[in-house]
Amino acid sequence: MLVPIVVEQTGRGERSYDIYSRLLKDRIIFLGGAIDDTVSNLVIAQLLFLEAEDPDKDIHLYINSPGGVVTAGMAIYDTMRYIKAPVSTICVGQAASMGAFLLSGGEKGKRFSLANSRIMIHQPLGGFQGQATDIHIHAQEILRMKKKLNELLAEHSGQTVEKIEADTERDYFMSGEDAKTYGIIDSIITRNTITGGSR
Protein backbone atom coordinates (compact mmCIF):
# COMPACT_ATOMS: atom_id res chain seq x y z
CA MET A 1 0.00 0.00 0.00
CA LEU A 2 1.31 3.43 -0.98
CA VAL A 3 1.29 5.78 2.03
CA PRO A 4 1.00 9.49 1.17
CA ILE A 5 3.67 11.90 2.41
CA VAL A 6 2.69 15.31 3.80
CA VAL A 7 5.15 18.21 3.60
CA GLU A 8 4.88 20.99 6.20
CA GLN A 9 6.68 24.31 6.48
CA THR A 10 8.27 24.84 9.89
CA GLY A 11 10.60 27.46 11.37
CA ARG A 12 13.46 25.16 10.41
CA GLY A 13 12.33 24.61 6.84
CA GLU A 14 10.33 21.79 5.32
CA ARG A 15 9.45 18.63 7.19
CA SER A 16 7.84 15.56 5.64
CA TYR A 17 5.70 12.99 7.42
CA ASP A 18 3.84 9.92 6.30
CA ILE A 19 0.13 10.70 6.63
CA TYR A 20 -0.36 8.52 9.72
CA SER A 21 2.47 10.24 11.61
CA ARG A 22 0.99 13.62 10.70
CA LEU A 23 -2.43 12.55 12.00
CA LEU A 24 -0.76 11.32 15.20
CA LYS A 25 0.46 14.89 15.81
CA ASP A 26 -3.22 15.84 16.11
CA ARG A 27 -3.89 12.83 18.40
CA ILE A 28 -5.66 10.91 15.64
CA ILE A 29 -5.14 7.16 15.23
CA PHE A 30 -6.54 5.47 12.12
CA LEU A 31 -7.48 1.80 12.44
CA GLY A 32 -8.09 0.65 8.87
CA GLY A 33 -8.37 -2.97 7.79
CA ALA A 34 -8.41 -6.27 9.62
CA ILE A 35 -7.28 -6.37 13.25
CA ASP A 36 -4.38 -8.76 13.77
CA ASP A 37 -1.46 -8.78 16.22
CA THR A 38 0.65 -6.44 14.07
CA VAL A 39 -2.13 -3.85 13.68
CA SER A 40 -3.01 -4.21 17.36
CA ASN A 41 0.58 -3.59 18.48
CA LEU A 42 0.81 -0.46 16.29
CA VAL A 43 -2.45 0.97 17.68
CA ILE A 44 -1.42 0.16 21.27
CA ALA A 45 1.97 1.83 20.77
CA GLN A 46 0.25 4.97 19.46
CA LEU A 47 -2.23 5.00 22.38
CA LEU A 48 0.61 4.69 24.89
CA PHE A 49 2.64 7.40 23.14
CA LEU A 50 -0.26 9.87 23.14
CA GLU A 51 -1.04 9.02 26.78
CA ALA A 52 2.57 9.80 27.72
CA GLU A 53 2.44 13.10 25.80
CA ASP A 54 -0.74 14.37 27.50
CA PRO A 55 -2.86 12.07 29.69
CA ASP A 56 -5.72 14.58 29.91
CA LYS A 57 -6.25 15.30 26.22
CA ASP A 58 -8.64 13.27 24.05
CA ILE A 59 -7.36 10.67 21.60
CA HIS A 60 -9.45 10.17 18.45
CA LEU A 61 -9.58 6.59 17.14
CA TYR A 62 -11.05 6.38 13.63
CA ILE A 63 -12.24 2.87 12.75
CA ASN A 64 -12.80 1.41 9.28
CA SER A 65 -12.45 -2.31 9.95
CA PRO A 66 -14.14 -5.62 9.13
CA GLY A 67 -12.95 -6.97 12.50
CA GLY A 68 -10.29 -9.55 13.12
CA VAL A 69 -8.60 -11.61 15.80
CA VAL A 70 -10.41 -11.41 19.14
CA THR A 71 -7.28 -11.40 21.31
CA ALA A 72 -5.69 -8.66 19.17
CA GLY A 73 -8.83 -6.55 19.49
CA MET A 74 -9.06 -7.16 23.22
CA ALA A 75 -5.48 -5.93 23.60
CA ILE A 76 -6.50 -2.61 22.00
CA TYR A 77 -9.68 -2.48 24.11
CA ASP A 78 -7.81 -3.12 27.37
CA THR A 79 -5.27 -0.42 26.51
CA MET A 80 -8.09 2.06 25.77
CA ARG A 81 -9.47 1.34 29.26
CA TYR A 82 -6.03 1.33 30.89
CA ILE A 83 -4.84 4.77 29.80
CA LYS A 84 -6.11 7.92 31.47
CA ALA A 85 -6.60 9.90 28.25
CA PRO A 86 -10.21 9.64 27.02
CA VAL A 87 -10.48 7.73 23.72
CA SER A 88 -13.14 8.98 21.33
CA THR A 89 -14.16 6.43 18.67
CA ILE A 90 -15.41 7.33 15.19
CA CYS A 91 -16.72 4.83 12.63
CA VAL A 92 -15.80 5.65 9.04
CA GLY A 93 -17.14 3.21 6.45
CA GLN A 94 -17.61 0.13 8.58
CA ALA A 95 -17.01 -1.18 12.06
CA ALA A 96 -17.79 -4.88 12.02
CA SER A 97 -17.20 -7.63 14.55
CA MET A 98 -14.23 -6.59 16.72
CA GLY A 99 -14.32 -3.19 15.00
CA ALA A 100 -17.85 -2.64 16.34
CA PHE A 101 -16.77 -3.82 19.77
CA LEU A 102 -13.94 -1.26 19.86
CA LEU A 103 -16.33 1.43 18.60
CA SER A 104 -18.67 0.72 21.53
CA GLY A 105 -15.74 0.77 23.97
CA GLY A 106 -14.91 4.44 23.40
CA GLU A 107 -15.46 7.11 26.04
CA LYS A 108 -19.19 7.45 26.82
CA GLY A 109 -20.60 10.49 25.02
CA LYS A 110 -17.69 10.42 22.53
CA ARG A 111 -18.59 7.44 20.33
CA PHE A 112 -19.51 8.56 16.83
CA SER A 113 -20.39 7.35 13.35
CA LEU A 114 -20.36 9.14 10.03
CA ALA A 115 -23.72 9.31 8.27
CA ASN A 116 -23.43 6.30 5.95
CA SER A 117 -21.26 4.00 8.02
CA ARG A 118 -22.32 0.42 8.73
CA ILE A 119 -21.91 -1.34 12.04
CA MET A 120 -22.15 -5.13 12.47
CA ILE A 121 -22.01 -7.32 15.56
CA HIS A 122 -21.84 -11.11 15.70
CA GLN A 123 -20.43 -13.93 17.78
CA PRO A 124 -16.71 -14.79 17.62
CA LEU A 125 -15.61 -17.00 14.74
CA GLY A 126 -13.20 -19.86 15.14
CA GLY A 127 -11.87 -22.79 13.23
CA PHE A 128 -9.55 -25.46 14.52
CA GLN A 129 -8.26 -28.80 13.29
CA GLY A 130 -6.68 -31.57 15.27
CA GLN A 131 -7.53 -34.23 17.78
CA ALA A 132 -11.02 -34.30 19.27
CA THR A 133 -9.73 -33.26 22.70
CA ASP A 134 -7.92 -30.23 21.24
CA ILE A 135 -11.01 -29.23 19.26
CA HIS A 136 -13.06 -29.45 22.47
CA ILE A 137 -10.54 -27.25 24.34
CA HIS A 138 -10.67 -24.59 21.62
CA ALA A 139 -14.48 -24.74 21.45
CA GLN A 140 -14.64 -24.08 25.20
CA GLU A 141 -12.30 -21.12 24.81
CA ILE A 142 -14.46 -19.63 22.03
CA LEU A 143 -17.52 -19.97 24.27
CA ARG A 144 -15.67 -18.19 27.09
CA MET A 145 -14.67 -15.37 24.73
CA LYS A 146 -18.23 -15.12 23.42
CA LYS A 147 -19.59 -14.80 26.97
CA LYS A 148 -17.04 -12.11 27.89
CA LEU A 149 -17.64 -10.10 24.69
CA ASN A 150 -21.42 -10.26 25.19
CA GLU A 151 -21.09 -9.03 28.78
CA LEU A 152 -18.86 -6.11 27.78
CA LEU A 153 -21.04 -5.17 24.80
CA ALA A 154 -24.08 -5.21 27.09
CA GLU A 155 -22.23 -2.94 29.54
CA HIS A 156 -21.29 -0.42 26.83
CA SER A 157 -24.62 -0.45 24.97
CA GLY A 158 -27.05 -0.65 27.88
CA GLN A 159 -28.71 -3.71 26.34
CA THR A 160 -29.27 -6.89 28.31
CA VAL A 161 -26.83 -9.76 27.93
CA GLU A 162 -29.76 -11.88 26.71
CA LYS A 163 -30.51 -9.42 23.89
CA ILE A 164 -26.84 -9.24 22.91
CA GLU A 165 -26.68 -13.06 22.85
CA ALA A 166 -29.76 -13.25 20.62
CA ASP A 167 -28.66 -10.46 18.26
CA THR A 168 -25.09 -11.75 17.85
CA GLU A 169 -26.19 -15.30 17.05
CA ARG A 170 -25.92 -14.25 13.38
CA ASP A 171 -24.50 -11.17 11.62
CA TYR A 172 -26.51 -8.17 12.89
CA PHE A 173 -26.09 -5.12 10.65
CA MET A 174 -26.94 -1.58 11.72
CA SER A 175 -26.97 1.88 10.21
CA GLY A 176 -25.58 4.75 12.25
CA GLU A 177 -29.09 5.55 13.49
CA ASP A 178 -29.68 1.91 14.43
CA ALA A 179 -26.34 1.79 16.28
CA LYS A 180 -27.24 4.98 18.15
CA THR A 181 -30.59 3.51 19.23
CA TYR A 182 -28.83 0.27 20.19
CA GLY A 183 -26.30 2.15 22.34
CA ILE A 184 -23.12 1.31 20.42
CA ILE A 185 -22.56 4.98 19.48
CA ASP A 186 -23.73 8.26 20.99
CA SER A 187 -24.05 10.50 17.92
CA ILE A 188 -23.92 10.64 14.14
CA ILE A 189 -21.69 13.38 12.76
CA THR A 190 -21.71 14.99 9.33
CA ARG A 191 -19.09 17.69 9.95
CA ASN A 192 -15.82 17.47 11.87
CA THR A 193 -16.58 19.14 15.18
CA ILE A 194 -14.67 16.71 17.38
CA THR A 195 -11.04 17.32 16.36
CA GLY A 196 -11.30 21.02 15.63
CA GLY A 197 -11.54 20.64 11.84
CA SER A 198 -13.82 22.81 9.71
CA ARG A 199 -15.04 23.08 6.14
From Swiss-Prot:
It is an enzyme of class 3 (hydrolase). CDD domains: S14_ClpP_2. Keywords: Cytoplasm, Hydrolase, Protease, Serine protease. GO terms for biological process: protein quality control for misfolded or incompletely synthesized proteins. Its EC number is 3.4.21.92. One of its GO terms (molecular function) is ATPase binding. One of its GO terms (cellular component) is endopeptidase Clp complex. InterPro entries: ClpP, ClpP/crotonase-like_dom_sf, ClpP/TepA, ClpP_His_AS, ClpP_Ser_AS. The active site is at S97 (nucleophile), H122. It comes from the Bacteria. It catalyses: Hydrolysis of proteins to small peptides in the presence of ATP and magnesium. alpha-casein is the usual test substrate. In the absence of ATP, only oligopeptides shorter than five residues are hydrolyzed (such as succinyl-Leu-Tyr-|-NHMec, and Leu-Tyr-Leu-|-Tyr-Trp, in which cleavage of the -Tyr-|-Leu- and -Tyr-|-Trp bonds also occurs). It holds the Pfam family CLP_protease. It is found in: Cytoplasm. Belongs to the peptidase S14 family. NCBIfam families: clpP (TIGR00493), PRK00277.1 (NF001368), PRK12553.1 (NF009205). Cleaves peptides in various proteins in a process that requires ATP hydrolysis. Has a chymotrypsin-like activity. Plays a major role in the degradation of misfolded proteins. This is ATP-dependent Clp protease proteolytic subunit. It comes from Geotalea daltonii (strain DSM 22248 / JCM 15807 / FRC-32) (Geobacter daltonii). The gene is clpP.
